Amino acid sequence: MSETPVTVPFVSFRPMERELDADLRGAFARVLDNSWYIGGREDAAFEKAFADYCGVRHCVGCGNGLDALVLILKAMGIGPGDEVIAPSNTFIATVLAISYAGAAPVLVEPTLESYNIDPARIEAAVTPRTKAIMAVHLYGQCAPMDEINAIAHAHGLKVIEDAAQAHGATYKGRKAGSLGDAAGFSFYPGKNLGALGDAGCVTTDDDALAERIRALGNYGSDYKYHHIYKGQNSRLDELQAAFLAAKLPHLDAMNAERRRIAARYLAEMHNPAVTLPAELPGCTHVWHIFAVRCAARDALEKHLNARGIGTNKHYPTPIHLQGAYAELGLDRGALPLAEEISATELSLPMFYGMTDAQVQAVIDAVNEFEG
């Protein structure tokens, strides 16, 4: 009698939810019992815990990761007439934040080894209008922050971390979120530290910046009905803060499991048609995404899907070829490395609670592919 094939979803929250069921239900009950839903003790407790975790003085909760970046830019006074350097290979929210602040994005190519921005290309993109560098820690690995910070210091620029995919990642022993002037995090449910809905935060050591960000996210108010900025409504609600506080003590263990899965992938996948990702020296990769490259990407995806293995693409169309950014005037071929990644990248299953059989099924299917 033949064995039932092992199916592997691209992602599943079920193992984590089962393990933390009592904690999450307790968090919900606690918020309901308190009958306080915005700006209360749960928010304050999580902000302190996450600031301590990242090794910074301040964490300011907000509505989502995009808002976190927008609030940082606005609090820094970056807006119309200014330019912000950002990687060409990233999720569109990175660049949308720059646009929402009124500034202009300047896209710089990544390295194929790291998928992160190439510091060797940043200097040439700096102009008199440049005000900041947006350093994205893509897929869970920190950008080369020493080089980025050195360039920023030489030109008087701010450094903003987009840490939406890098909860718990480290660079030379320091946590993502503590490596620039400020960092934006997303707590979208699929993140390594995810809420049960949308949520985000900003981390920083800058006292004045944190105060401005908190006011900007609360209608520009420093105290009730007193508005010193033209702000917006972007706050971390009590329920999501309570859920995040329940999950945070488990983040390192969950990241360690992702690293264990990634280690097996890296050690046991040996298909010459598939280029595996790398953990760079000085970095602790938390493997939010396990991104491989394959010239026959679509065929590989079809092969894996036919075997019950879920996949995704991060990201199938680069920023400069999206209709939303036609204004940049960058045609196909303008940013060849971002285009190569978008045409060849495939994301393999990676989530807390994958069974050994599921991990083995992914490895076997990749190795069996004839590209």
Model-derived features: where do they sit?
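PLP-dependent aminotransferase-like
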Residues: 74-163, 170
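Short beta-strand-to-turn element immediately C-terminal to the catalytic PLP-Schiff-base lysine
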Residues: 185-186, 200-205, 245
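Conserved active-site segment immediately N-terminal to the catalytic lysine
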Residues: 161-196, 224-228
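PLP-dependent aminotransferase class I/II
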Residues: 3, 14, 26, 41-48, ...
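Phosphate-binding glycine-rich loop
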Residues: 35-83, 96-101, 107-109, 174
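Hydrophobic/aromatic ligand-binding patch that stacks against planar heteroaromatic rings
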Residues: 96-98, 151, 175, 192, ...
